[in-house]
Regions:
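Beta-strand-rich domains and repeat architectures in extracellular enzymes and scaffolds
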Residues: 4-39, 61-62
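Multi-bladed beta-propeller domains
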Residues: 1-14, 41-59, 77, 87-102, ...
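A detector of repeated loop/turn-to-beta-strand junctions in beta-rich toroidal repeat architectures
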Residues: 35-37, 81-83, 126-128, 170-172, ...
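Blade-terminus and WD-like Trp-Asp/Gly-His loop motifs, strongest in beta-propeller folds
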Residues: 17-25, 61-69, 106-114, 151-159, ...
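Cap/lid segment of the alpha/beta-hydrolase catalytic domain
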Residues: 324-440, 446-447, 455, 459, ...
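Active-site-proximal cap/loop segments of hydrolase catalytic domains
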Residues: 400-589
Length: 589
């Protein structure tokens, strides 16, 4: 029998583990209370203990390498202005005390007495680098312009590795000497290149990282800090997605994204591949070595398993699930995985997609478009997808051109003036589905996926039965004008510049073609969204209503870019389901 939507939305997740200094406990995040909070569990197993008790989401937690204390991040109402808090020894204290600024935690000093982070404290726009003693005030150690994050703190405490981001697919790494304040560019390059997961070796002479500088895919590499040369350690065939180095330098844990699934690889500290544990199939992330470097904690999820924290003894132990996140009484055996398919598009390319099929032969279909656009639909656990499958829907998740996971060249196929080619890929997904007898088709997506929903409805109005736009972009010009200043700088290389490309951006924005929308539309947005301002939703709703179209609008006062709170998800998603049931069932007769 099908379960009500609320049951699926109450399926829990545990993720983001961090080891206590003695290696006996793991702190992690879980949404068991309805909003992600920090919890702790003994490594040997046992009942977990809640550590934070807030109404707002905790977005990250990290143990100090020394002493019984940790730092966690939290924002308010989805505004993404994360603040940093110290928790330990019965004390909970706001370290940042600057609610108007964004703070990105970068790590503890090796002695555990101070932290590093980047923040917009100075002017609200630029991410300066700060070091703060846990008992003192923040100190700017690098006054910057633009968007920066901290990749690693050298084991001897002498320098930081800082990432300067130019776009979602282009960044540089800098060495910041904490004694002199001198910065050194580590990754000179031309064009776009990513340098991810940087980890400094114990002797401070090299950095392990993942980069696509010298190829089409992101490969594992070792950067020599004296010569700046990079030795590549994996082939140029799939993206390396995770890199973590043990404290003693003995082990390097790596995973690659192979057709959306994670391929785990274990290396010795000198960069040579070693036999490793047999990991369960799924998507791995959040690698964290134990203080003694002999165990690895990680998060595992998959289409048929909700996220949980696992640990494994190295080099070849049996992975063990440490947390037991509830499936709300729904048997995991009812969860379905996708088929990996490819379909032809207008220029002869083959577009990869995940196709989730129910038992019904001629099911209504929801085409679910990922955001980004530099992102990828992967076979992770998605309660909404599983509900739709149980309800008799098929779900089709295409990775149209511009997606990551298939090489740098593929990611750039939708840049600026090529934007609408990705919308053509959506139209050809419908053609492929119709060839298989599937006629009643809705399109749904969030963030940039919401833009794709609106673009699909305006460019190809006859193909769609309904559309669901969640925190989506209706007008690329007003989006770039109103999003955060640092985000505008990151997004213009992808979408186009307001200064140079305004006319083109206006020509492809769905808001200027809203009269073409023929299918019923549902729009969902958070009032505090700092990425895609709520004015994007207001514009398209007003325009569709003015044109006499059918539109439902759900606005949540205490949310930002998406729905983080269970009470709001319990309100929104059943309404989305009712909307789809009504319009797709009507179309199917």
């Amino acid at each position: 029998m099908p379960y009500e939507f609320a049951r699926y939305l109450k399926i829990r997740a545990a993720y983001g583990a961090t080891w206590s200094p003695d290696g006996r406990r793991l702190a992690f995040l879980t949404d068991i209370t309805g909003v992600p909070q920090a919890w702790e569990v003994p490594v040997g197993g046992g009942w977990p203990e809640q550590l934070t008790f807030h109404e707002e989401r905790v977005s990250g937690v990290r143990y100090s390498p020394k002493g019984n204390k940790l730092v966690y991040s939290m924002d308010v109402g989805g505004n993404e202005r994360s603040q940093l808090f110290l928790l330990g020894n019965g004390e909970e204290r706001d370290l940042s005390r600057a609610p108007e600024a964004i703070h990105y935690f970068g790590g503890f000093a090796p002695d555990g007495e101070s932290i590093a982070y980047t923040a917009t404290r100075r002017n609200g726009t630029d991410f300066d680098v700060f070091v703060q003693d846990l008992s003192g005030e923040p100190e700017i150690v690098w006054k910057t312009t633009g968007y920066h994050t901290i990749a690693d703190w050298a084991p001897d405490g002498s320098f930081l590795v800082v990432s300067r981001h130019y776009s979602n697919v282009n960044n540089d790494l800098y060495k910041l000497d904490l004694g002199s304040g001198e910065t050194t560019l580590l990754t000179p390059h031309e064009g776009d290149a990513r340098f991810l997961g940087a980890r400094v070796t114990p002797d401070g002479t090299c950095v392990f990282l993942a980069t696509d500088r010298d190829g089409d895919f992101v490969r594992l590499g070792r950067l020599d800090l004296s010569t700046l040369e990079i030795e590549h350690l994996t082939p140029d065939d799939w993206d390396v997605e995770e890199v973590e180095l043990s404290e003693n330098g003995r082990w390097l844990a790596v995973s690659r994204n192979v057709e959306g699934y994670s391929d785990f690889m274990l290396f010795g500290g000198r960069g040579r591949r070693a036999p490793g544990p047999a990991m369960p199939q799924g998507i791995l992330g959040g690698f964290e070595f134990s203080p003694d470097s002999m165990r690895l904690a990680f998060t595992l999820t998959g289409p048929d398993r909700n996220p949980d924290v696992w640990i494994v003894d190295l080099p070849d132990g049996e992975p063990r699930r440490l947390t037991r996140s509830s499936t709300a009484g729904i048997p995991p055996s009812t969860f379905r995985g996708p088929k990996l398919v490819r379909y032809p598009t207008f220029d002869g390319r083959e577009i990869p997609a995940l196709f989730y099929e129910p038992d019904a032969t001629y099911a209504p279909v929801v085409v679910n478009v990922h955001g980004g656009p530099e992102s990828q639909s992967r076979p992770l656990f998605a309660p909404v997808t599983q509900y739709l499958l149980g309800r008799g829907y098929a779900v089709f998740a295409p990775n149209v051109r511009g997606s990551t996971g298939y090489g740098k060249a593929y990611t750039h196929l939708d840049d600026v003036e090529l934007r609408m080619d990705s919308v053509k890929d959506l139209a050809h997904a419908v053609h492929w589905l119709r060839e298989r007898g599937l006629e009643s088709i809705a399109v749904m997506g969030g963030s940039y996926g919401g833009f794709m929903v609106l673009a699909a409805l305006t460019e190809y109005p006859d193909l769609w039965t309904a559309g669901v736009d969640i925190v989506g972009i209706a007008n690329l010009v007003t989006f770039l004008e109103n999003t955060g200043n640092y985000r505008r700088a990151l997004r213009e290389p992808e979408y186009g510049s307001l200064e140079r490309d305004r006319e083109f951006l206006e020509s492809i924005s769905p808001i200027h073609k809203a009269e073409k929308i023929a299918a019923p539309l549902m729009v969902v947005h958070g009032k505090n969204d700092p990425r895609v301002p709520v004015t994007e939703a207001e514009q398209i709703v007003e325009k569709v209503r003015k044109n006499g179209g059918e539109v439902e609008y759900l606005l949540y006062e205490d949310e930002g870019h998406g729905l983080a709170k269970l009470k709001n998800r319990l309100d929104a998603y059943p309404k989305i389901a009712t909307f789809l049931d009504e319009h797709l069932a009507r179309a199917g007769g």
